[in-house]
Amino acid sequence: MGALGLQGRGGRPQGTGCLLLAVAGATSLVTLLLAVPITVLAVLALVPQEQGGLVMESAGLGAQAQQGLSKSNGLPSRLHSQIPSSSKNPFLRPGALSSHGKHPWVATLPPIVASTPVPGFQQLQEEKPETDLSSRLPAAHLIGAWMKGQGLSWEAKKEEAFLRSGTQFSGAEGLALPQDGLYYLYCNVGYRGRAPPSGAGPQDRSVTLRSSLYRAGGAYGRGAPELLLEGAETVTPVLDRAGRPQYRPLWYTSVGFGGLVQLRRGERVYVNISHPDMVDYRRGKTFFGAVMVGLVPSASLGKCLHSANV
């Protein structure tokens, strides 16, 4: 008798079913083993590509922003290649997203100030320095000084005194101005004195102090001075009930004035005072001077505009 094969239910041999089951199991195992590395490789291959896409997108946005900035500033096209993009910026992380999670950060350069004006903006014009004429205009400032045997004299080189732009001073002839023009003249004389002696009459109790500015020379001649400006001050004592003066041991006052005068070249200005023995020579008390403030027509020279007494 021959050998009989194994049969299962339905009359089918059991060896064929086991073989098919083994083949299916092996196929599933191989498929599972191959799927894992393929998946890993696919992930590794896709992730850099996406990040690179983000970087390229940020670079594209940065290039567009830089291109628009260069157009608004008037930069030539040859400078576009010199502007680094965000992909070359070491401070920008590739693929870094903004706080909103929508757009990546774009690194841009600070705006470049162009020499050409931008439409819609006002351009400040350079202010040219104004020419200072004060240093070239004739001017003088003299201070009072006491000189032994002469009394009041004028100092032109000490303390605040000065002569500028051709002005000259002589104690005998006065202040000479170098050119025709409109000048501002000023004078201030300080006075001080003591109470009058007791028993003096009423007419001797008041003292009127005068200071005057004269001009001479030029069209007026050496011996024909003309009064330009003058100021006066009267010192009157306060009387007590008995009618006696109540002077303090010393009294102080000053006479000051100034005004505009049209002067010609060669004319000289000098000061005349009524009580030279009462002049106060302390610093800042007695002085006079002149400063040119403008030009005037030659036909109107010789006129004087007086100002009120100070």
Curated annotation (Swiss-Prot):
Q: Where are the transmembrane segments?
A: 28-48
Q: Give the membrane topology, semicolon-separated if more than one.
A: Single-pass type II membrane protein
Q: Give the highest taxon in the source lineage.
A: Eukaryota
Q: What is its main location?
A: membrane
Q: Can the keyword DNA-binding be found in this entry's annotation? A: no
Question: What ranges does the Cytoplasmic topological domain annotation cover?
Answer: 1-27
**Gene3D superfamilies, alphabetically?**
2.60.120.40
- Role, per record: Cytokine that binds to LTBR/TNFRSF3. May play a specific role in immune response regulation. Provides the membrane anchor for the attachment of the heterotrimeric complex to the cell surface.
Instruction: Name the InterPro entries for this protein.
Output: TNF, TNF_C, TNF_dom, Tumour_necrosis_fac-like_dom
- Where is the THD domain positioned along the sequence? 138-293
Q: Which GO terms describe its cellular component?
A: extracellular space; membrane
Q: Which GO terms describe its biological process?
A: immune response
Q: Where is this region: Disordered?
A: 67-86
Q: What is this protein called?
A: Lymphotoxin-beta
Quaternary structure, from the entry: Heterotrimer of either two LTB and one LTA subunits or (less prevalent) two LTA and one LTB subunits.
User: In which family does this protein belong, per the annotation?
Assistant: Belongs to the tumor necrosis factor family.
Residues bearing carbohydrate: 272
From the broadest rank down, the organism's phylogenetic lineage runs: Eukaryota, Metazoa, Chordata, Craniata, Vertebrata
User: Which parts of the sequence lie on the Extracellular side of the lipid bilayer?
Assistant: 49-310
What are the alphabetically sorted keywords of the record?
Cytokine, Glycoprotein, Membrane, Signal-anchor, Transmembrane, Transmembrane helix
The subcellular location is:
Membrane
UniProt keyword annotation of Transcription present: no
What are this entry's molecular-function GO terms? cytokine activity; tumor necrosis factor receptor binding
